[in-house]
């Protein structure tokens, strides 16, 4: 158990040299050592991954990253292998009933919004995710958290904005999960190699392209006042 969060972690790999890959897997401590508000909500979740995102910027660029992440669709990226994996996943979910309305938040599991302290509950929840079944939990100046649930697991996507050693800032993403019994544990173990070898690299390239293409564009007005 992590002393900072109570969440379990599978063991991160050391960060690689900057620029070696579009998305770089980081040690668990890059998430657990920071005073994120998400720690209050996920003590019974396992920290699955921490990634440095190819999205460098200044102190006020976090809303732009949130807008990008909320509209990203990894199932429509340039990698044919990644697209095929996503298509297979959605078809399996439909066939096996993994993604039905009785499997999500508010039915199979309680939403983590029920755990929000007053300061977060009364603040902005964040954007709606356009492509994936994530529901926003909260949005601050340097954190955005969203949850999803299905028959296999209850998961949290945590996107943050951290200072780097060069005096700038960069995006960071953490994935936390609570597998649903043996089915969930087996599913998470089965997809792990595909996530590391195909899904996350393709997603990193997609983020990098869009981040560079959107440079200089203001974030949506609904995100420009993150508090």
Regions inferred by a protein language model and the residue ranges of each:
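Hydrophobic ligand-binding cavity/cleft-lining segments
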Residues: 2-123
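Glycine-rich loops and low-complexity Gly/Arg-rich segments
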Residues: 76-79, 161, 171-172, 185, ...
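Short C-terminal domain-edge/linker segments immediately following a structured domain
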Residues: 82-85, 175-179, 202-209
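An exposure/low-complexity boundary signal
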Residues: 106-127, 132, 217-227
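Hydrophobic-ligand binding "helix-grip"
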Residues: 121-165
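Short terminal or interdomain "cap/linker" segment that borders an active site or interface and mediates
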Residues: 143-145, 153-156, 165-166, 170, ...
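Beta-strand/loop substructures that line and gate deep hydrophobic ligand-binding cavities in soluble
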Residues: 150-189
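A conserved amphipathic terminal alpha-helix motif
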Residues: 187-218
């Amino acid at each position: 158990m992590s002393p900072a969060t109570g969440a379990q972690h599978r063991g991160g790999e050391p960060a690689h040299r900057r620029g070696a890959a579009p998305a770089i897997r980081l040690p668990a401590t890059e998430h657990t050592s920071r005073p994120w508000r998400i720690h209050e909500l996920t003590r019974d979740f396992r920290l699955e991954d921490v990634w440095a995102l190819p999205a460098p910027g200044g102190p006020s660029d976090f809303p732009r990253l949130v807008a990008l992440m909320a509209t990203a669709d990894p199932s429509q990226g340039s990698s044919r292998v990644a697209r095929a994996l996503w298509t297979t996943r959605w078809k399996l979910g439909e066939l096996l009933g993994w993604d039905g309305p009785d499997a999500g938040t508010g039915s199979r599991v309680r939403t983590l919004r029920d755990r929000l302290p007053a300061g977060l509950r009364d603040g902005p929840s964040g954007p709606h995710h356009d492509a994936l079944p994530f529901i926003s939990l909260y949005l601050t100046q340097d954190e955005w958290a969203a949850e999803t649930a299905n028959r296999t697991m209850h998961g949290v996507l945590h996107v943050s904005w951290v200072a780097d050693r060069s005096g700038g800032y960069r995006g960071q993403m953490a994935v936390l999960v609570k597998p649903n019994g043996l089915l969930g544990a087996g599913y998470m173990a089965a997809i792990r190699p595909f996530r590391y070898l195909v899904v996350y690299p393709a997603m990193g390239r997609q983020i990098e392209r869009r981040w560079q293409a959107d440079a200089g564009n203001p974030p949506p007005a609904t995100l420009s006042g993150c508090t």
